[in-house]
């Protein structure tokens, strides 16, 4: 089994995790990033997705992050998330409803140019990506 290392995961409003893990999988900007003890130092941006922490006993904890940064050192990793939540805390029904509304707003052709919709299009797409990532974190947590 891998050597444990210290991990801190914080968002502007709270600290979500502080403890030892043997592995982290995080959603880096250009793909999933797997971290073990003694990883080479790096800093990367995170995109919306799930952070999976594997503890020494094999238990996996799943968190959702909306984006942020990860700093990796040989014996510790710090994740600074824009927004974050434990997958167990997320309300699946509320997220599904919000996702359906966002998809409808993005896809609904009404035949007229809707300048308000055009201004908010990018924001709606970002929200849709975040909602989809939250649902994926919930599903992973249930496994």
Swiss-Prot record:
Tell me which UniProt keywords the record has, alphabetically: ATP synthesis, Cell inner membrane, Cell membrane, CF(1), Hydrogen ion transport, Ion transport, Membrane, Transport
Q: Which CDD domains match?
A: F1-ATPase_delta
The record's listing under Gene3D superfamilies reads: ATP synthase delta/epsilon subunit, C-terminal domain (1.20.5.440), F0F1 ATP synthase delta/epsilon subunit, N-terminal (2.60.15.10)
Annotated membrane topology: Peripheral membrane protein
Highest taxon above the source species = Bacteria
Segment forming the signal sequence? none
One GO MF term on file is: proton-transporting ATP synthase activity, rotational mechanism
Q: Where in the cell is it found?
A: Cell inner membrane
**Quick one: where is this thing mainly located?**
membrane
Keyword Mitochondrion attributed: no
Cellular component GO terms held in the UniProt record = plasma membrane; proton-transporting ATP synthase complex
HAMAP family cross-referenced by the UniProt entry: ATP_synth_epsil_bac
Family named by the database record: Belongs to the ATPase epsilon chain family.
> What does the record give as the function of this protein?
Produces ATP from ADP in the presence of a proton gradient across the membrane.
Subunit info?
F-type ATPases have 2 components, CF(1) - the catalytic core - and CF(0) - the membrane proton channel. CF(1) has five subunits: alpha(3), beta(3), gamma(1), delta(1), epsilon(1). CF(0) has three main subunits: a, b and c.
Protein name per the record: ATP synthase epsilon chain
Which organism does this record belong to? Dichelobacter nodosus (strain VCS1703A)
Gene of origin? atpC
């Amino acid at each position: 089994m891998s050597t444990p290392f210290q991990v801190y995961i914080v968002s502007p409003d709270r600290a979500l995790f502080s403890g030892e893990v043997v592995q982290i999988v995080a959603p880096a900007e250009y793909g999933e990033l797997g971290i073990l003890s003694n990883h080479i130092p790096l800093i990367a941006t995170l995109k919306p997705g799930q952070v999976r922490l594997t503890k020494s006993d094999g238990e996996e904890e799943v968190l959702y992050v909306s984006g942020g940064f990860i700093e990796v050192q040989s014996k510790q990793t710090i994740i600074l998330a824009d927004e974050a939540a434990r997958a167990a805390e997320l309300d699946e029904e509320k997220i599904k409803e919000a996702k359906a509304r966002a998809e409808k707003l993005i896809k609904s052709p009404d035949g007229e140019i809707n300048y308000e919709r055009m201004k908010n299009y990018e924001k709606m797409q970002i929200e849709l990506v975040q909602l989809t990532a939250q649902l994926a974190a919930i599903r992973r947590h249930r496994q």
